[in-house]
Swiss-Prot record:
Gene this chain is encoded by: EAF1A
Quaternary structure and partners: Component of the NuA4 histone acetyltransferase complex. Interacts with ARP4 and SWC4, and (via HSA domain) with TAF14 and TAF14B.
Family matches, as InterPro entries: EAF1A/B, Homeodomain-like_sf, HSA_dom, SANT/Myb
An individual GO BP term: regulation of flower development
Name this polypeptide is given: Chromatin modification-related protein EAF1 A
């Protein structure tokens, strides 16, 4: 837009739509000579009068035309009518017609509907009714414009007058009026709403629509865009038509138009009325009155539009005439001509035009707004405007136009003033708005905006003269530029750039001016192209004068036409006007509807006719085909008859000779003849062979036995075939024999019964096979393949029919299972008994084997022709139950399919019943009921229930019964429903028993879907229908009835259930499904599911007191009989009372007991790593709680906790095992060895494999608290669980996952944890439990236990972590255990180390505890969770602690947690999960414990369970252990470095090692492997971490860095420091206690003393301090780990290593490398960084030596990042290491500063600084990113999100992530502190302790946000890590110092900014 002419404001505005047209018209016409002003005033007056009269006239004309008086719109209505769609006659055609003359765009905007179709392609520019509407929106302007147009365009006088009138009348209501215009009237309301709603839009849109046209587009863009801003006003003020400087825009395009438009607004209308409008009016008038009005409005708009367009399209004259009334056109022409000509022709002119435009812009914009529509209207006609002749003819000559324009310019000036004044608010606004759009033109426009009225008017006037001059100058150009104008109009862009292509743009501008001038103007322009600007002025003036004359004439005419129209014109719309409009709209709608209906009817009729025609054609086609077929058949018959006639008489040789001769002759004569001869010869030979074969076999038919004998058949056939191998004919005798045999068999079967039938069928098949019809196509039920294999096609058809018949019989008799085996197996395998045999007891064996030929497609799901894949068991065994097959098939097609699938009908009853049961399980249906009532519509006997079959073969039936009885054990009574599903036969039963599971799935190899398979396999649909129907019936039938309650349900019916059942039946009657639902909903808590059949059977049993014999009568017996056990005093309908009475207390007690037991279980199951048991899972709290205990391989056992029944369902489904609907406990009876093993491990007390109750589990795992003993990663959670148990109560709820509930105890979170574990494995962070569930968990936790002490805090975490389980973890630092457990357990595969992994999903919550997901399990408890509420951490401390831990722990463990989440959540938190918050021990163990879960958990346990003293003692012990571990881990880490995968576990230990400086060297070796083994890290690292962490923990503990030992620990240390500051007790913090004031120093000392172990702790601490420092004042972390903070700085590399270690535990095993390792890790992660890590390791060593905190910091960083991005972590760690090194060098002071800042309480600042550093320090950022982003960098934001609740953690994690960058500052400070052993850390630590809590929270947020922000930079920078050189680190350090400072500043100044990322 702006590209147009810089001079033309409008150009820019309008550039969009039309290109330069609008632009060219922009400035011209701005200047209005006094004369023009006077003229404009006169014109305005004239216009008003004219409008009134025109309105009257228009009304009269409208009525004369037969218009609906309601549709007619007065004044405003007229304008509206312009828009009004009601005036369909105003349609584009009308506009086009009337304005086409004028080359109006009106065509485009003819339809009221088109109001919205501004961009209509039809319109050259998009000029449309919308344009008109927009113009009308600026009705007052439009009125003026229309008046002008009418004046200009006498042709349009009608329209013009109408529109002008309407415009005038609706000056205030123009917007609505416009909508109400004839065209738009129907949609007036809609349009109004749109326009009113979006006046700017409509104006702009409309303008844009207009702009769609040449000038119009531009005007619209500019006016439109401007109009958008302005148009709203304009739209609001329909008067604003004038305001819309649409025309002026065009004037800008066409110079004059703008003034004209302005004038249009007021004077312009007058002028329009005077002269210019006439033309428009003429064009408009051509349209119907309303159309005319609309057109007039359009015309005005058009006129203006056309003016612009004309310039653009060279249709300016036309545009002027049509769109820019002569006046508008003239003025526009003059102004635009001058401006445009100058502007378009000359950039100067354009500039002036812009100025003019500025002046005009104001008015012009107003005008434009109003005229944008006009322009639009004229857009289409614009191109027509190209036809100057048309314009000339239509409009006044150019000269007139020019003169008019001259007048207009003046008038426009006045008009502009008036209009601007009138519409200044709107118009001016519009202008201003428009102007902004054309900022190039904005100067003038803005000026106009500023002085919309006065300035715009003045400018308009002034610029009018200038424009006129320019137009005069450019008028010449106009004509010359007419083409250019056209081009511009065609190419709005060029016009848009009218300023750009000066010459062409100017030309178009001039052209636009001419167009604006109107036809007359255009002529004048044409004539004037050679003339000078003076001529232009003269022409303008003349045109204006002419326009005035025209206006006067119009006035007279109007006066004649209508008197007293003025009042109408002036009057504002009343409600009746709106009513009329609405009526018109409705009428239009009705008309439209009628049209639509008519159209629809026509279409329907057409379709009907077409359909009939098609049918007729089809019939003809069929007839033709029939004819052809008959001809062909006749020909074939004739051929064969002729051949037969010839053959007998001729010898083969003779015929051959003849044929040969014939062939030769024919070859000579005709190739065809030869061919025919050859064919004939072949046919004769074939017949001969056939005859001979028949003769040969003549004996065969006499000996059916022989025929049946496959050998004989084969031999005979072979003999025959060998003679003539070419022919494979079926011996006729054979077929006959076969047919007879089949028929006899069928007859026999019918007589004897289904079994016989089966035999017969089988024998028939066998016979077929014997006969040598190996194919035995008939075997295919479908018959589709019946002829497939038949030797002779002819006979084949017969055999096919036979087979079909037989099949039908078989199907009837066998219910499509006659060949059940065959359904998968081919029925008629050549083998003989192939399929039906199986059904028939006769050939079960062969059925098993015979599967080669798919004989019958029983409705097996796969429809496979498997050769009895299950054949032996199913086929051979199943054959007997043909009936069953039939019955089952009938009963349930699915079962039938299944039966056939499994073995065919043999299994039918038993199998089918089984199938139904198994169908769900993919076992054959064991439809006891189905078998009981085989409704297969098999043959009569089989068709009858299979019982008939049984009658036939009672022994089999009995056997089946026995089998069914036995089967329940074997099968999980699929439905529990089927008593002994009487196995069809023993074989079937055996198969069922043997294949209960196998049959269902393996038999067919495909599991059929009952419906699909049946249908697919069904021989015929009828059968399938029968099957289905039968199935339903069969279901009702119970085969052998076994009390479903006994064997049918996995769980025996309890008394409560019996009572409930009886009561429900009593109340509800035998509505078994309803009762089942009620029972299930009531018994949800027990996880017991009773299906309707079960309920029915049980009720029968209860009522009948029989084993289930009365099952059939269950329905009958259910209601009437009373149940003895029914609670007394419960009347009918009291079931609800009963349930309430029985259920309420039971549920409460059950839930309580369940929860307590779950907690106990959690303790017990301290997740022995060996637990093969999937674990006890709190499946969900359905009512209160549903527990699903999965023991062993997933066999479900009911946990008979008072109310607790673990449903096999859930277990099985959870395990993926087939489910019995939880009915059969017996089915579970045999416990697999693996299950026993698992159970023995998990439930040592329950080795008998009996059903375990949660109590049993609890008893079994009482030792769970021995975290140390349970360190095994296998069940690390068990360890944690116990330690967490104290918090576990809370944890369960906190985690937000049910598993979380046991935060500590995995068992509680078993299900969740399992999921978590899975999630952890797959790095899938788990979503948090629903709030209500969390709430429930919280409540339960609180309610449930004393150990739920943490529950409140946990619940808070749960609430906090509500969004994410991790978050849940967050709230409960202790909850960490829960969340951690919950999440962590799942998080890491290694048992509850998995918890650490779990922490990963819990990461959020774990993060809350500080990235120490698992550590959070413990750590959060200690301090990890804000709501640690753990005994470990006081609730308040928990929060700060959590913050701290999150910050501190968050740094290393927190990040790992995130990392873990992001990463495989293997490392997730293991390294970081150091339970920094938990205890320093936990922290120490955290990385490893996290990794190991158990070791951590032990730490966690003790901290969790133990408060200060216990924890301290425990921490001390753990520290010792930790030290041992650290030593071990150092060793392990060294080799783990080599073995990354498992070393990860060790490396997590290395993490601990990194926590302890000792391990840092060890860690180093693992670094390279660890990075490589990062993915495995999570599982192994957890294990190793546990193992190592324990030593580390002990070491760290010994070091006195409760949190230092591990990055997690360090994180904990931060929290612990805070906590210690609060609680100095925490075991890990005992040293911290000592160090509380001097913690940092002590930590530094310890770290130094510990070497890397301390460094690691320090790193952790530093990480925490970073996190805390970043999130919390590092000082705080420094406080708690002032030394850590200090060491971190010096040891940033070490810290990186440590972090890495910590994180490595979770992710890379950088943690083992500790600081060095982390450095290596980052490098190794980035790529071949191991050497770099080695260097870094050296650096770390140096760092460790320097302060050991440096290694710690890198460790923390790594820890932070590693979980998030093992690879990313490595780079970031590397970077961090480098940075740390630099920092150590440069940043020691900086670090000190940072630490000091942290201490200053600027934890946020430090966080921010760190965050800033993060971005600046790619390495550190990488760490942050890695840490935060569980996945790579992205994890960070996630971490932040996850850490939202764990703000501390999040920030901790973020700071941990930041540490690299933050470490730049924080770590730098730390490293400096550490290196310099500055007590600053320590000293600052205490100082920042309070800040830490706040800062951590604050800073964490900031840090997290910051980190998120810096993540990108981190991501970018991670590449740096690849540069492991110390130089890089130094550079980073050097860079970081400023960054630290900046970051500090940022953190202090804009903590919230961190959210940016």
């Amino acid at each position: 837009m702006h590209g147009s002419v810089s001079g033309y404001l409008l150009v820019n505005a309008e550039v969009d739509s039309m290109g330069g047209v609008i632009d060219s018209g922009g400035g011209i016409g701005v200047k209005t000579s006094p004369r023009r002003t006077a003229i404009e005033k006169a014109q305005a007056e004239l216009r008003q009068e004219y409008d009134v009269r025109e309105e009257r006239r228009r009304e009269l004309e409208f009525l004369e035309k037969g218009g609906n008086p309601l549709d007619f719109k007065f004044g405003i209505a007229t304008s509206h009518s312009v828009q009004s769609t009601s005036l369909t006659d105003q349609q584009a055609e009308h506009f086009v017609n009337s304005e086409v003359k004028d080359s109006f765009a009106l065509t485009a905007s003819p339809h009221g509907d088109s109001v919205e179709s501004s961009g209509r392609p039809g319109v050259p520019t998009i000029s449309e009714p919308n344009t008109a509407d927009n113009l009308l929106l600026f009705d007052s302007e439009n009125k003026s414009v229309e008046g002008e147009r009418n004046l200009r365009h006498p042709n349009r006088q009608n329209r013009t007058s109408e529109s002008e009138r309407s415009s005038k009348a609706h000056t205030n209501q123009n917007t609505k009026e416009t909508e109400d215009s004839a065209i738009f009237r129907p949609y007036a309301r809609r349009n109004r709403s749109k326009i009113s709603r979006d006046p700017a839009r409509s104006s702009s849109t409309d303008l844009v629509q207009n702009r769609g046209g040449l000038a119009t587009s531009i005007s619209i863009r500019r006016g439109s865009v401007e109009g958008k801003g302005c148009i709203p006003e304009a739209a609001n003020q329909k008067d604003m038509h004038t305001t819309s400087v649409s025309c002026p825009v065009f004037a800008n395009s066409n110079g004059n138009i703008v003034p004209k438009n302005r004038v249009s607004s007021n004077s312009l209308n007058t002028k329009v009325d005077g002269e210019p409008v006439v033309r428009e009016s003429t064009a408009g008038s051509k349209t119907s009155l309303l159309k005319d009005e609309a057109d007039i409005s359009y015309s005005k708009s058009s006129a203006y539009l056309p003016v612009g367009e004309s310039g653009l399209a060279g249709e300016k004259a036309q545009l002027v005439s049509t769109g820019g009334s002569p006046k508008a056109a003239t003025i526009a022409g003059q102004k635009n001509s001058s401006t445009q000509l100058n502007g378009l022709r000359d950039s100067t002119v354009e500039e002036e035009s812009l100025t003019n435009r500025g002046a005009t812009g104001t008015n012009g914009l107003e005008s434009e707004s109003s005229h944008a529509n006009n322009v639009e209207v004229n857009v289409d006609n614009e191109r027509d405007l190209y036809k100057v002749d048309k314009l000339d003819s239509d409009e006044i000559s150019m000269q007139k136009t020019l003169r008019v324009e001259g007048l207009l310019d003046q008038t426009v000036g006045e008009m502009t003033k008036t209009k601007i004044e009138d519409e200044t608010g709107q118009s001016t606004t519009i202008i201003s708005e428009c102007i902004p759009e054309c900022e190039m033109q904005m100067k003038s426009v803005k000026i106009e905006n500023q002085s919309h009225r006065s300035t715009a008017e003045m400018q308009t006037k002034e610029k009018s003269s200038e424009t006129e001059k320019r137009l005069q100058d450019g008028l010449v150009v106009l004509e010359n530029d007419s083409k250019v104008g056209s081009i511009l109009s065609e190419n709005p862009s060029s016009t848009l750039c009218s300023g750009i292509p000066q010459a062409s743009v100017d030309t178009s501008s001039c052209t636009v001016g001419n167009s604006l001038l109107s036809g007359t103007d255009i002529e004048a322009l044409k004539h004037q192209p050679s003339s000078d600007a003076v001529m232009l002025d003269t022409v303008k003036e003349d045109a204006i004068l002419e326009e005035a004359r025209i206006i006067q004439a119009k006035k007279k005419r109007i006066a004649e036409l209508s008197c007293g129209t003025a009042p109408v014109e002036v009057r504002e719309k009343s409600q009746w006007d709106f009513v009329l409009e609405e009526m018109a709209w409705l009428a239009n709608d009705f008309a439209q509807e009628r049209l639509w209906k008519m159209t629809a009817a026509a279409q329907i009729c057409h379709r009907v006719a077409l359909t009939c025609q098609l049918r007729f054609e089809e019939r003809n086609q069929h007839r033709k085909l029939k004819k052809i077929a008959s001809v062909l058949s006749n020909a074939i018959l004739q051929f064969w008859s002729s051949v037969e006639a010839e053959v007998p008489g001729e010898l083969e040789e003779t015929s051959l000779g003849i044929v040969k001769e014939t062939c030769q002759e024919s070859n000579c004569l005709n190739g065809r003849r030869c061919l025919a001869a050859g064919v004939k010869e072949y046919a004769s030979r074939f017949l001969k062979y056939n005859n001979s074969s028949i003769s040969y076999h003549s004996a065969a038919p006499s000996t059916p036995d022989n025929m049946c004998d496959p050998e004989i058949l084969d031999i005979s056939m072979v003999d025959q075939l060998t003679e003539a191998s070419l022919f494979y004919s079926v011996p006729s005798g054979a077929m006959e024999v076969y047919l007879k045999s089949i028929e006899s068999h069928l007859t026999r079967c019918e007589k004897s019964g289904s079994s016989m039938q089966e035999e017969v069928d089988t024998s028939a098949y066998d016979t077929a096979g014997d006969i040598g019809y190996n194919v035995t196509a008939f075997d295919e039920d479908e018959g589709e393949t019946s002829t497939y294999y038949l030797p002779g096609a002819f006979e084949s058809s017969r055999s096919f029919n036979i087979s079909h018949k037989k099949r039908k019989n078989l199907m009837k008799s066998h219910s499509a299972r006659s060949y059940d085996l065959g359904d998968d197996l081919p029925y008629v395998n050549n083998t003989g008994g192939s399929n039906s045999s199986s059904l028939m007891a006769k050939r079960p064996d062969s059925n098993i084997n015979a599967g080669s030929v798919p004989t019958r497609r029983v409705r097996t799901a796969s429809r496979q022709r498997v050769v009895s894949p299950f054949g032996c068991a199913t086929t051979g065994n199943l054959p007997v139950p043909s009936k069953t097959d039939a019955s089952s098939g009938d009963t349930s097609s699915f079962q039938d399919e299944y039966s056939s699938l499994h073995g065919g009908s043999a299994v039918q009853k038993g199998t089918e019943v089984e199938s139904s049961v198994n169908f769900e399980k993919l076992l054959p249906y064991d439809m006891a009921e189905t078998s009981g009532r085989p409704k297969k519509k098999k043959k009569t006997h089989q068709g009858s229930a299979y019982d008939q079959t049984w009658h036939l073969d009672p022994s089999v039936h009995v056997e089946q019964k026995d089998h069914w009885k036995k089967r329940p054990e074997n099968n999980f009574d699929m439905n529990g429903l089927y008593g002994p599903h009487s196995a069809k036969k023993q074989k079937t039963t055996k198969q069922l028993v043997e294949n209960n599971f196998d049959m269902a799935i393996p038999h067919t190899g495909s599991i059929p879907s009952p419906a699909a398979s049946q249908m697919s396999n069904m021989s015929n649909p009828n059968k399938s229908i029968k099957f289905i129907g039968g199935r339903d019936r069969g279901r009702k039938i119970k085969g052998l009835k076994i009390s479903p309650g006994q064997h049918g349900s996995g769980n025996p019916w309890s008394l409560f259930e019996d009572q409930a059942l009886v009561v429900l039946v009593h109340d509800m009657g035998p509505n078994w499904e309803l009762i089942s639902d009620a029972m299930n909903s009531t018994l949800k808590i027990k996880c017991i599911y009773r299906n309707p059949t079960e309920c029915k059977d049980r009720h029968k049993i209860l009522m009948d007191k029989t084993a289930g014999d009365g099952a059939d009568s269950a329905e009958d017996s259910g209601n009437s009989q009373s149940y003895p056990s029914t609670l007394p005093g419960i009347p009918k309908g009291s079931a609800r009372q009963l349930f309430q009475r029985l259920q309420g207390p039971m549920e409460e007690d059950t839930l309580k007991s369940h929860f307590e037991k779950i907690c106990l279980i959690g303790k017990k199951l301290h997740y022995r790593k060996t637990q093969s048991v999937i674990g006890v899972s709190v499946v969900s709290f359905v009512h209160g709680i549903q527990f699903s205990s999965c023991t062993g391989a997933g066999i479900s056992q009911s946990l008979d906790i008072p109310g607790l029944h673990v449903s096999k369902y859930s277990c099985k489904s959870w395990l993926g095992f087939p489910e019995n609907d939880g009915r059969d406990s017996k089915q579970i009876v045999p416990v697999h060895n693996s299950q026993v093993m698992a159970l023995s491990q998990v439930f040592p007390n329950n080795l008998n494999g009996g059903v375990l109750t949660p109590l049993d589990v609890c008893d079994a795992s009482t030792s769970g608290q021995d975290v140390f003993s349970l360190e095994n990663p296998g069940l690390p959670m068990l360890n944690q669980g116990t330690p967490v148990l104290p918090t576990s109560g809370a944890h369960p709820s906190t985690p937000g996952s049910s598993g979380v509930v046991l935060s500590n105890n995995l068992p509680t979170t078993s299900g969740l944890q399992s999921a978590s574990v899975r999630d952890g494995r797959f790095n899938v962070p788990r979503g948090s439990l629903p709030l209500d569930e969390q709430h429930r968990l919280q409540q339960f936790n609180q309610t449930l236990s004393g150990r739920n002490l943490q529950q409140p805090s946990l619940s808070t975490p749960a609430a906090v972590s509500g969004s994410d389980r991790g978050h849940r973890m967050v709230p409960g630092g202790n909850a960490m255990g829960v969340s951690g457990m919950n999440r962590n357990t799942p998080m890491s595969r290694p048992g509850f180390q998995g918890m650490a992994s779990s922490a990963m999903p819990n990461t959020g919550s774990m993060l809350s505890s500080g990235m120490v997901e698992i550590p959070n399990t413990g750590n959060i408890h200690s301090g990890g969770g804000a709501s640690q509420g753990n005994s470990m951490i006081r609730p308040r401390e928990a929060v700060q602690h959590m913050m701290r831990m999150q910050a501190a722990q968050g740094n290393s463990p927190g990040i790992p947690a995130f990392s873990n989440l992001s990463s495989g959540f293997t490392n997730q938190t293991t390294p970081v999960q150091a339970y920094p918050g938990h205890l320093s021990q936990q922290h120490q163990m955290s990385p490893q414990s996290h990794v190991l879960g158990n070791s951590h958990h032990p730490h966690l346990q003790s901290p969790s369970q133990a408060t200060g003293a216990q924890q301290e003692a425990f921490a001390i012990r753990q520290r010792q252990i930790h030290q041992r571990y650290l030593q071990q881990q150092q060793q392990q880490q060294q080799f783990p470095a080599s073995g990354s995968m498992m070393p990860h576990v060790q490396q997590p230990q290395g993490s601990s090692v990194s926590s302890s400086p000792q391990n840092s060297p060890q860690t180093q070796p693992p670094v390279s492997p660890q990075p490589l083994s990062m993915p495995p890290v999570s599982p192994s690292p957890n294990i190793n971490a546990m193992a190592q962490q324990k030593p580390q923990k002990s070491q760290l503990a010994l070091h006195g860095l409760g949190r230092s030992p591990q990055s997690g620990t360090s994180g904990v240390n931060n929290q612990a420091g805070k906590q210690r500051q609060r609680q100095l007790q925490q075991s890990a913090r005992q040293h911290p206690h000592q160090r509380q004031p001097t913690q940092g120093q002590q930590l530094n000392k310890q770290l130094k003393g510990m070497g890397r172990g301390n460094m690691i702790h320090q790193n952790i601490t530093v990480d925490q301090s970073h996190l805390n420092g970043l999130t919390m004042p590092q000082g705080n972390q420094a406080t708690e780990k002032g030394e850590i903070a200090v060491p971190v700085r010096p040891d940033q590399q070490s810290s990186v290593g440590t972090t890495t270690s910590t994180n490595l535990q979770s992710k890379p095993f950088v943690s083992p490398l500790s600081s060095n390792h982390s450095q290596q890790l980052p490098k190794s992660f980035p790529g071949a960084l191991p050497p770099s890590p080695q260097q870094q390791m050296q650096l770390h060593s140096d760092n460790s030596i320097q302060g050991q905190s440096s290694p710690a910091t890198p460790c923390n960083i790594l820890s932070t990042s590693s979980p998030s991005i093992a690879p990313a972590v490595a780079p970031s760690n590397h970077q961090h290491l480098l940075i740390h090194q630099k920092q150590r060098n440069q940043v020691q002071s900086t670090a000190q500063r940072v630490v000091q800042h942290n201490h200053l309480g600027n934890s946020e600042l430090s966080k921010k600084s760190q965050a800033e550093r993060m971005p600046r320090v790619p390495q550190s950022v990488t760490n942050t990113t890695q840490t935060v982003s569980m996945g790579t960098t992205k994890g960070m934001p996630q971490a932040s999100n996850d850490l939202k609740n764990i703000k501390a953690v999040g920030s901790t994690a973020v700071p941990a992530l930041e540490p690299p960058s933050c470490v730049a500052s924080v770590q730098i400070t730390a490293s400096k502190v550490v290196n310099s052993s500055n007590t600053d850390s320590a000293g600052n630590d205490p100082v920042s302790t309070p800040n830490q809590g706040l800062a951590q929270k604050h800073g964490i947020k900031g840090v997290t946000q910051r980190q998120q922000q810096s993540l990108p930079s981190e991501e970018k920078r991670p590449k740096l890590p690849e540069k492991p050189t110390v130089q890089n680190q130094k550079h980073l350090a050097s860079e970081e110092q400023p960054h630290l400072e900046e970051a500090q500043e940022l953190s202090s100044s804009k903590p919230p900014d961190t959210k940016v990322e």
